[in-house]
Amino acid sequence: MKISMRRTLCVFGAMVALSAPSAAAEEPAVIRYCHGFGCKLSTTVRFSSVDMTELKSIVRAGRSSAEAEREALGRADQWYERLAGAASGTSTDKAKGGFGEVYDASQLDCIDESRNTTTFLKLIEKRGWLSHHTVGKPKVRGFILDLRYPHNTATVIEKETGEAWVIDSWIPANAEFPDIMPLKIWKKKGVLGRN
């Protein structure tokens, strides 16, 4: 009787373990990815459930502080550009969008980059994965007469301080870590093309 009872408990325990809910899989996502300068072209980028689970892990690794979250958003942007680059043929996007290569569909200007990064950040925000920031509107600096070419960037706003931070993925090449700094510092940069 003891053996039969043990066997029954083991079988019952195994059934409970197998029927226990696993971690909820993340819903897939689809976003529009701009390229070809001025969002002239766009490619649909699809993120599978596995992709979204990986992205959540990258972003949530930064939940300990605002600084850690910005670092995690930089890593998430790199991850995003690798996937989007493969899907859109822009994985060879050069630093500063191959400045001067206006008709090259594999390159992105700062308008493409700021729209893409903002769209991506809004996806993260909509999923509820941001602890310390909200997504801001894209910002611009320069207007030629101040010796700076016009340049756009994505932004996030730190919840605790209200300070705006840029996540500028146009400066580096595809899938390299973006420039992340306070908006007030970014606004002063870019004179004569220097960053």
Task: Show where each model-derived region lies.
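Bacterial N-terminal signal peptides that target proteins for export
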Residues: 1-10
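Bacterial N-terminal signal peptides
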Residues: 10-19
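Sec/Tat signal peptide C-region and signal peptidase I cleavage site
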Residues: 20-26
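Glycine-rich catalytic cores of cysteine/serine-nucleophile enzymes that process amide/ester linkages
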Residues: 28-49, 147, 165-194
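Acidic/histidine-rich, surface-exposed loop or edge segments in extracytoplasmic proteins
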Residues: 35-67, 93-103
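Extracytoplasmic/periplasmic, Sec-exported soluble proteins
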Residues: 47, 65-72, 102-113, 146
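Mid-length scaffold segments of soluble, non-membrane domains
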Residues: 75-133
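Hydrophobic/aromatic-rich core segments of domains that either
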Residues: 122-186
